[in-house]
Swiss-Prot record:
Family: Belongs to the CinA family.
Source organism of the structure: Clostridium tetani (strain Massachusetts / E88)
Top-level taxon: Bacteria
Identification of the protein by name: Putative competence-damage inducible protein
InterPro entries named in the record: CinA, CinA-like_C, CinA_C, CinA_KH, Competence-induced_CinA, MoaB/Mog-like_dom_sf, MoaB/Mog_dom
SMART domains: MoCF_biosynth
NCBIfam families: cinA_nterm, molyb_syn, PncC_domain, PRK00549.1
Length: 409
């Protein structure tokens, strides 16, 4: 079975709200083995919605609409659905009763226009709304399914889980299972080059690369009769990719760099401290994202000025005078200094030129040094990251964590 999603609402077209419903629906449909072929947005215009329904049903046998079930005149989704299937509208007494009870519980008076929400196309399966006043419905005809859902996420999510999923499972066989491999230290083009033969020859399972937030993900997806069979298709492919990419793969599914590192530090009773200049606390902040990091994170210092570098973490004045604040030598002394002063096993530092000004020919904007002190061993890495100030800082943090991971785990 193939599906399409149509978001109805001028507010979405204008960018006033973000269409998170499509993301939720696509994920849930994929879990059921239903492929989403197309997504679209139409304003509160009946003719355009009808045109979109016509085109959608040429490609797919399931069309899901979100929005347009409200009480106003421009909420026309159900009426257009009825026109498309040549059906009349009828008053669903139970839905009207539920709407009245909802208003009563809210201490409000039912407006006459809210009764409009209790009207549905004939022969519809009604989907109760336990969190609002707009019930949904499903129309079925000649192996075509039109599923009309409300717009607010707090209403559509429980409605889809409680009513739509059980309904569709009666008609759909098989599951679509995905596993995500998370990669750091390689760009998307490099990853694709290394595993291109797997991507070009894919059928089932499939491999889909995606770059985001200075990392690359590979989504491995298999379709089978059940989850066990799907995973048996994914595992050999995963092993082959791991053999190629090695320790550039840091985790799977919902893993994060900071989570992988934090878990390792806690399990091995290791303590860490950070000293940051150009990243201004972002590095420590990433570590704090991991619940339980208090068991191993001693402190984080933002030593932005030279005085702070000298007085707080013991960077030598001679080092700053000779090499400058942005240098390998300073980065090493920062990492070692924060580890020694805090009693941590590991110190990590950042110092660089985030821009947009302040760069020179020898030390351009984007230059950064990341220093490490790991159980008595000190070293630093030099990088030049293009982009604006914020992207440079974010990239620095991700790379700093990844090099720490590769030197620890």
């Amino acid at each position: 079975m193939n599906a399409e999603i149509i978001a109805v609402g001028t507010e979405i077209l204008l960018g006033d709200i973000v269409n998170t419903n499509a993301q939720f629906l696509s994920k849930k449909l994929a879990e059921m083995g239903i492929s989403v072929y197309h997504q679209s947005v139409v304003g509160d215009n009946g003719n355009r919605l009808k045109e979109e329904l016509t085109e959608s049903f040429k490609r797919s046998n399931i069309v899901i609409t979100t929005g347009g079930l409200g009480p106003t005149k421009d909420d026309l989704t159900k009426e257009i659905g009825a026109e498309y299937f040549n059906r009349k509208m009828f008053l669903h007494e139970e839905s009207l009763k539920n709407i009245k009870n909802y208003f009563k519980k809210q201490g409000k008076i039912l407006n006459e226009n809210n009764e409009k929400q209790a009207y549905f196309p004939e022969k519809s399966t009604i989907l109760p709304n336990n969190f609002g006043t707009a019930p949904g419905c499903i129309m079925e005809e000649n192996d075509k399914f039109l599923i009309m859902l409300p717009g607010p996420p707090k209403e559509i999510i429980p409605m889809f889980k409680d009513y739509v999923i059980p309904y569709l499972k009666k008609f759909n066989e098989g599951v679509l299972i995905s596993k995500v491999l998370r990669i750091c230290g390689m760009g998307e083009s490099k990853v694709v080059t290394e595993i291109n033969h797997l991507i070009e020859n894919q059928t089932n399972p499939t491999v889909a690369p995606y770059a985001k937030d200075n990392e690359v993900t590979l989504r491995l997806t298999a379709k089978a009769k059940n989850e066990k069979e799907a995973l048996s298709l994914i595992y050999p492919l995963e092993k082959e990719i791991r053999d190629i990419l090695g320790n550039n793969i840091y985790g799977t599914d919902s893993d994060t760099l900071e989570g992988v590192i934090g878990k390792f530090l806690i399990e091995n009773n290791l303590y860490i401290a950070t000293a940051e200049s150009c990243t201004g606390g972002l590095l420590c902040g990433r570590l704090v994202n991991y619940p339980g990091i208090s068991k191993c994170l001693v402190e984080g210092i933002v030593s932005y000025s030279n005085n702070s570098k000298m007085n707080r973490i013991g960077v030598k004045k001679e080092t700053l005078n000779k090499f400058g604040a942005v240098s390998e030598e300073t980065a090493i002394e920062m990492a070692k200094g924060v580890a020694n002063s805090s009693g941590a096993d590991i110190g990590i530092s950042t110092t660089g030129i985030a821009g947009p000004s302040g760069g020179t020919y020898e030390k351009p904007v984007g230059l950064v040094y990341i220093g490490y002190y790991i159980k008595g061993k000190s070293f630093a890495k030099k990088f030049i990251f293009p982009g604006d100030r914020q992207s440079m800082r974010n990239k620095t943090v991700t790379v700093a964590l990844d090099y720490l991971r590769k030197n620890l785990i």
